[in-house]
């Protein structure tokens, strides 16, 4: 995804080693309860998209569901590329007996989740997903629906304790 966001002042890349460990069957303990498949989309020699299909078996048992997840998704603004990536994961999920696809999600709730739908002009963080504004448009076009809202806030720490708080501290 680094090339996809090259020159974007709001994108904060994740740590490559951390992502490689997360995606590694040998290093990520989530694979004790999960299985995954990874797809890359190419145009010529150039990678133009990626997606992971994940089945979190433990979560499916707890919630009595047959859901696959999609995550680690990035793509250029091209309908053919997006459709091919999602068709591959949808087909894989159906072959595995899943009846729904949910995401973007990772292996566990400790992984990055969600898709940015506004605030594209705000700097991202390493703890959140950043994506281009065209991502939600492609999701809607393919018939995917938003499940819930996630909100991110900035908290500014003042250089000094505000006078009002000092007075409250004295009273207490």
Question: Where would I find each of the regions flagged by the language model?
Answer:
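A short helix-loop-beta-strand connector motif used in the catalytic cores of GNAT acetyltransferases and
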Residues: 24-43
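Short beta-strand element of the conserved SAM-dependent methyltransferase core
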Residues: 4, 39-41, 153
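Conserved beta-strand in the GNAT
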Residues: 38-40, 46-56
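Acyltransferase donor/substrate-recognition loop-hinge adjacent to the catalytic core
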Residues: 129-172
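Structured loops at beta-to-helix junctions and adjacent beta-edge loops in soluble globular domains
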Residues: 44, 56, 73, 106, ...
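Short amphipathic alpha-helix that is part of the acyltransferase structural core
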Residues: 1-26, 66-69, 150, 167, ...
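Acyl-donor binding region in acyl/amide transferases
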Residues: 60-145
